[in-house]
């Protein structure tokens, strides 16, 4: 706060805290990211300075190719929610591909997550995790945007058709999005046919959360019973219509056509 006062930015104290606070060094809590706060003092504009200093390629790969559960947690993080889990004190890189707790431990150690609360039971620590700050949230949003803009160009056209209520175009572009996304989120582990639709669905929801932020509140039912996945878009402004999307997995053995 003294530094902000010295630069004539006392009125920006709360915003600076939301953007760059949240780090811990040993027993020191609520530490500001020195690189980000220094750049902010110089440029006087709130931007993700630290998050843009590296490609974050490993983090992106872990989330993009991760299980549906990992993507669901990322949905919650982007919505400002928390996630409770046990953590591994020692991060073993060989475990990142199959052990979800190792992924969250790495993100915590890397400064992308912070511990909001924790409990110790039976000698085991369980932590409540949240995104570290606004800078990190924007970094993850930008990461998701790049996934779809670079590898699934039809996605943007689908969103436009959705908002314009163009059902014919929606069907055309959704097929393209599905085909491109299946391969893009493929980790090379040959997931089962049952798992493939869920991998697509949760990647798709992440894209909606980012693409429609500020215009719609996006929620998913998280349940895939009988091959159905639902997404509800609640308008934040009275001029937009509410939208409910239902995805159904086509079973050729039970259905002769999609219309059935």
What are these regions (language model features)?
Residues 32-260:
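Extended alpha-helical interface modules used as scaffolds for assembling large macromolecular complexes
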Residues 1-40, 73:
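Amphipathic alpha-helical segments of the small helical/lid subdomains adjacent to P-loop NTPase cores
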């Amino acid at each position: 706060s003294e530094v902000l006062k010295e630069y004539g930015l006392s009125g920006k104290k709360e915003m600076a805290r939301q953007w760059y606070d949240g780090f811990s060094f040993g027993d020191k809590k609520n530490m500001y990211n020195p690189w980000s706060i220094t750049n902010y003092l110089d440029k006087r504009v709130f931007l993700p300075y630290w998050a843009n200093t590296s490609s974050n390629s490993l983090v992106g790969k872990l989330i993009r190719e991760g299980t549906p559960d990992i993507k669901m947690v990322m949905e919650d993080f982007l919505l400002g929610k928390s996630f409770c889990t046990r953590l591994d004190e020692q991060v073993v890189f060989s475990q990142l591909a199959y052990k979800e707790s190792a992924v969250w431990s790495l993100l915590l150690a890397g400064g992308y997550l912070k511990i909001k609360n924790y409990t110790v039971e039976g000698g085991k620590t369980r932590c409540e995790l949240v995104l570290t700050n606004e800078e990190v949230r924007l970094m993850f949003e930008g990461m998701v945007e790049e996934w779809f803009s670079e590898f699934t160009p039809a996605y943007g056209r689908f969103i436009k058709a959705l908002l314009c209520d163009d059902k014919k175009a929606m069907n055309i572009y959704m097929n393209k999005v599905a085909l491109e996304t299946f391969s893009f989120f493929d980790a090379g582990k040959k997931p089962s046919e049952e798992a493939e639709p869920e991998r697509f669905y949760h990647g798709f929801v992440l894209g909606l959360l980012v693409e429609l932020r500020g215009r719609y509140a996006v929620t998913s039912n998280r349940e895939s019973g009988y091959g159905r996945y639902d997404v509800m878009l609640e308008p934040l402004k009275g001029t937009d219509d509410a939208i409910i999307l239902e995805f159904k997995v086509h079973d050729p053995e039970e259905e002769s056509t999609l219309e059935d």
